[in-house]
């Protein structure tokens, strides 16, 4: 009874038989079980191993790289633990949600379909306390001016 083996094993055996003594057969790419190459001769092309029509898995978006950049601007010699980074990321997400919610309320109240920098500025004044709000507004105004001038 003939031995039924997967096609990949047959190719390796045939390559080993045909090579002259002293030369090693070319190593073939091994794929995980159940996977096949998207093109013949191992070329993956533009799909990068994904099936046609399938979407790439979206990673979780965080503010970690931006927190780290600001930390290095302020204190270049200090690091941050992963737990502290996670807390900072949660803090920024929380503030963002509060400001977005307040801005949406303001836009709805004024019967406007769009949240503009004016709604954001007002929501910053409402959400953040005293001196922190003043500083945030001045930094935000500076950032918007820089953005519009470039």
From Swiss-Prot:
The keyword Cytoplasm does not apply. The modification N6-acetyllysine is found at residues 4, 29. Phosphorylation of H2B was not detected. Core component of nucleosome. Nucleosomes wrap and compact DNA into chromatin, limiting DNA accessibility to the cellular machineries which require DNA as a template. Histones thereby play a central role in transcription regulation, DNA repair, DNA replication and chromosomal stability. DNA accessibility is regulated via a complex set of post-translational modifications of histones, also called histone code, and nucleosome remodeling. The nucleosome is a histone octamer containing two molecules each of H2A, H2B, H3 and H4 assembled in one H3-H4 heterotetramer and two H2A-H2B heterodimers. The octamer wraps approximately 147 bp of DNA. Belongs to the histone H2B family. This is Histone H2B.2. It comes from Triticum aestivum (Wheat).
């Amino acid at each position: 009874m003939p031995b039924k083996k997967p096609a990949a094993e047959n190719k390796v055996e045939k390559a080993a038989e045909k090579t002259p003594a002293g030369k090693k057969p070319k190593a073939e790419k091994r794929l995980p079980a159940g996977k096949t190459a998207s093109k013949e001769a191992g070329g993956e092309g533009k799909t990068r191993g994904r099936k046609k029509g399938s979407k790439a898995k979206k990673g979780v978006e965080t503010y970690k790289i931006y927190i780290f950049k600001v930390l290095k601007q302020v204190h270049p010699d200090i690091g941050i633990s992963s737990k502290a980074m996670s807390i900072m990321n949660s803090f920024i997400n929380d503030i963002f949600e509060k400001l977005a919610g307040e801005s949406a309320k303001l836009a709805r109240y004024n019967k406007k379909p769009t949240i503009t920098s004016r709604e954001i500025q007002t929501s910053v004044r409402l959400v953040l306390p005293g001196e922190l709000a003043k500083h945030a507004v001045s930094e935000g105004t500076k950032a918007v001016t820089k953005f519009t001038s470039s």
